[in-house]
Amino acid sequence: MGSAITGWGSALPDKVLTNADFEAHLDTTDQWIVERTGIRERHIGGSTRGLAIEAGHAALARAGLAGADIELVVVATTTPDQTLPAASATVHEALGCRGGAFDLNAACAGFTYSLVLADSMITAGVRRALVIGSDTLSRSTDFEDRATAILFGDGAGAVVLEAGARDDLVLAYDLGADGTAAPLLYAEIGGFIEMDGREIFRRAVRAEVDSIGKVFAAAGCTADDIALFVPHQANVRIIEAVNERIGLPMERTVVVIDRIGNTSAGSIPYGLADAANAGRLDEGDLVLLSGFGAGMTWASVVIRWGRRGVA
């Protein structure tokens, strides 16, 4: 028996920063930002915990479950509200879950790491898991720095995994890291995000294309078999470059960066929930998730969408 995604949800803060807001105090324009990033607006505010709880509630409701039905909570985040306790513990309590809870920090690739790990724990005996990606990068953003201020937003996404599916959820995955790239994107404790955007772009495209090639080979599929691609929403030009290299049309790709910016671990589950709510996913579809982040870390996974026998 495998697992299946039976619920999904997302959350964004109410406050919206548009590109026009940056035009007022930075040497930039809406056209410049859109051409280089694809971003038109981003949401900021709230807490990592609060957004995670909201997204988790939505995912549970979609799955028709209560918090007490959940035996494992995994929260992917690089921006916990406090050093101790883990965000997952407070989310676990707020939602009334049972079993274990832990945080996972793999930066923007964190949700994909967490999904793979939760699926393996279901194989080992967990019946139901709640996997959340939640980040509030605005708290680490210098809004006087044009290079980073325009990029980041706050947000969360969540999925419920349940055991009992006839087929495996995860067909193949690839996880990777390269610590030599750590100086290219980092934030000291209490400091702002520092990044070398040009080099990050180059390495991200290369790492993601290589990772996707590995999961295609392991899953025995090609880009033609993928019904939908949900990439990390860092920069639309990165998404376009990856798609061109793997031979996947943008029409089969989720792009939400224009309205949420880069929400780190929240971006892939947010995009997945957005696609599911829009009716872009059908039973049995092969879905590609892929992302990269500080570390550098990267992760790709091919999953099969649908309940397929889950009661």
Predicted regions and their residues:
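Phosphate/pyrophosphate-binding loops at sites that engage ATP/ADP/AMP, CoA/4′-phosphopantetheine
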Residues: 55-71, 210-227, 275-280
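Flexible, glycine-rich active-site loops centered on histidine and acidic residues
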Residues: 119, 123, 127-155
